[in-house]
Amino acid sequence: MQYLRRTNDAFCAGAQVVKGRQMAMNPKASWVAGCYDLYFSAFDLFFNRPRANGGLSCKLVGTGFALHQTVLEQLGGWNTQTMAEDAEFSAQCARAGIRIGWQPEAITYDEEPVEFAVSLRQRKRWCSGVVQVGRRMLPELSRCSGRLAWDMLCFLLTPQLAPVSALLMAFSQLCAGNAAFSPAALAASAAGYWIGCTGLAACLLLIERPAGRRNWRAVAMFPLFMASWLPLQLLAMFHRTTVWREIPHTGGKNHDFA
């Protein structure tokens, strides 16, 4: 009921599409499920909150959003054809100048995978879907002049440019010579990344999650979870996921809504 009340508050304030805050239903089921919970918190902190404060759209995901009937009437119904319907619908809203509002007090709980291999398959599908949306919607968004459309265009361009970024990074390391590939330099780089990621994860866990929902194994493994996005994104550029496969969710005995 809290989700419906807070969503209705946003509609009464003038929002047409509302995205609530998402948490893992089973954050202590495994380190993988706990990493999803941390990822959602980080995404809200660094993506949704700044965009909400700046008058831009937050990002829809498949769980926990609501839309006004007039939006479907304006867009001619729900017309999505990619593997990432949420991203495609977000792009359609941006093209039409419809802002997606963020309501952090409208909370939904989503059961997450507990195995890393399953997580890789799910996130590969997400990455592939966003690439599909980009190839479908970028030409249309580039012809729009509004801030919402340009912000979405930048979001969809990011995965398209991932291979270029990886090549430029590799080229810069080659130009730096042997010093860039020395064991000491590689170890220092890896240590800095790991400390930064675990530090962020620990802060998110302590600040945003009560003691009963804290999974410290997830904090230790969060750098691996985040690093795995890059190969998944690169793979999605060259190997499309076109068939939906069921993602097992088997953490039902570890639900914690505290």
What residue ranges belong to the model's regions?
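Catalytic core of nucleotide-sugar-dependent glycosyltransferases
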Residues: 38-45, 120-140, 200-203, 232-237
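C-terminal catalytic/acceptor-binding lobe
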Residues: 88, 104-130
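Active-site-adjacent helix/loop segment of glycosyltransferases
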Residues: 118-168
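Membrane-proximal soluble regions of multi-pass membrane proteins
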Residues: 122-133, 217-257
